[in-house]
Amino acid sequence: MRIVQIIDSLEIGGAEKMAVNYANSLAEKIVFSGLVTTRREGNLKSQISNKVSYLFLERNKTLDLGAILRLREYCKDNKVEYLQPHSSSYFTAVLVKIFLPKIKIIWHDHMD
């Protein structure tokens, strides 16, 4: 399995911590575990395992085509099969899926 967690930032918070924990735990059990931060890095970056592939997109607007294309290339280069966006990062995952329709999305909503 080749899976990437997608989260808006690595500031300290519940969804952010869960994304880091998932990426770290999966890195011990599967072929490829990645973590992509779309908008901001933060204090949780230091907790990412060196076994996790990390990408910071530096996305600065809702529809940042450059960031989407960088994520698409990252997914292609790493043969990613699953995207697991957390909360509002779902939109980013859907845009990547338009370019890479074989990728499956597992949405993790933290609102309820």
Model-found features: residue ranges?
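Membrane-interface segments of envelope glycosyltransferases acting on lipid-linked substrates or membrane lipids
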Residues: 1-112
